[in-house]
Amino acid sequence: GDIILPFKNYCRERITLEIEKGFITGIHGGFEAEYLRDYMKYFNDPEVYGISHIGWGLQPRAQWTAMGLHDRNDGMCMDARAFYGNFLFSTGPNTEVGGKRKTPCHLDIPLRNCDIYLDDQAVVLAGDVVAPEESKAR
């Protein structure tokens, strides 16, 4: 049920990413992992494997199911990136967040039902935002 953008598909198999020092060093699983590996390899650029940014969805009106309800060529799948409680994991360029990595390959991977901790403080548990009240925007 996780989503890989720009592929605009719901994953139906487990894909395991090995990450060391901020870079993907291995992609394991079945067909979907092979598809992801080949897509990233095509760019022939080690920077495509770099982690660019992370975040989590806060929009209660965004729907995880929205991508399946529209033509694949319509829109940018913003619901997939924003639905409440997702963990958004991204690879590739990071210049928009102050980094220096430039590469044409960018993946956004919204993950469902994750547990996210920052400095040992729970932020998302099983897809529910539990960040401390003082850290939430008003």
Predicted segments — roles?
Residues 1-138:
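Metal/cofactor-centered catalytic core regions of large enzymes
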